[in-house]
């Protein structure tokens, strides 16, 4: 065997091994460095630390094993707060036949929003008073999703601009539809 034949056979061997090894190495690098987030379909942020409804001060006796959309009201409910409540309500109503499986919940800090609460009671909302413990855990102006087992699993920041409000409603509706579609509980 000549030198050129040996170098050709070695090159062929290296190429054959490379064809199988290089994609594995690239895939490992892509996963560890998070180059691709194409597999993520949720719009809200998943919570890193587990959070229980009792830690938020939610009275679970008033809610019968349903999915919850929880909104922590700020101290003063301005126009953005009203628009957030409207967006949550519209997303809730857009669920259609799935609405009996979902309950929107408002966490009211020390009962300060009576006029707002009387308006919401007509729309199938649960109003819960926030305790001091809940105030420490619930960020005001944040929207949470909780499963029927009482685990808070997803969080959304309150939108600030008109475009963000439109996107927020679509995102919340999309996530709720997926959760309800694949849920075997509640």
Model segments located where?
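Short extracytoplasmic/periplasmic juxtamembrane "stem" segments immediately C-terminal to an N-terminal membrane anchor
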Residues: 41-59
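Thiol-/selenol-based redox modules, centered on thioredoxin-like
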Residues: 153, 157-186
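Short active-site neighborhood of thiol/selenol oxidoreductases, capturing the structured segment around
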Residues: 62-80, 88
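Conserved helix-turn-beta segment immediately C-terminal to the redox Cys motif
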Residues: 85-105
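Hydrophobic membrane-insertion alpha-helices, especially the h-region
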Residues: 10-32
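Short, internal strand/loop/helix patches
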Residues: 103-105, 115-149
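Short acidic, S/G/P-rich loop/turn micro-motifs used as interaction or catalytic elements
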Residues: 75-80, 111-113, 160
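A short, hydrophobic beta-strand/beta-hairpin element that forms part of a small beta-sheet core
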Residues: 88, 141-159
């Amino acid at each position: 065997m000549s030198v050129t034949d040996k170098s050709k056979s070695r090159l062929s061997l290296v190429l054959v091994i490379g064809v199988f090894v290089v994609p594995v190495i690239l895939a490992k690098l892509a996963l560890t460095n998070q180059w691709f987030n194409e597999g993520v379909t949720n719009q809200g942020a998943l919570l890193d630390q587990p959070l229980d409804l009792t830690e938020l001060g939610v009275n679970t006796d008033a809610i019968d094993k349903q999915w919850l959309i929880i909104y922590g009201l700020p101290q003063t409910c301005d126009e953005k707060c009203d628009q957030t409540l409207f967006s949550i309500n519209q997303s809730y109503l857009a669920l259609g036949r799935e609405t009996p499986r979902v309950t929107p919940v408002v966490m009211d800090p020390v009962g300060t929003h009576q006029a707002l609460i009387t308006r919401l009671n007509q729309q199938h909302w649960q109003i819960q008073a926030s305790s001091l413990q809940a105030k420490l855990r619930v960020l005001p102006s944040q929207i949470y999703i909780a499963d029927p087992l009482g685990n808070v699993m997803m969080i959304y920041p309150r939108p600030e601009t008109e475009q963000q409000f439109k996107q927020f409603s679509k995102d919340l509706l999309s996530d709720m539809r997926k959760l309800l579609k694949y849920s075997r509980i509640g």
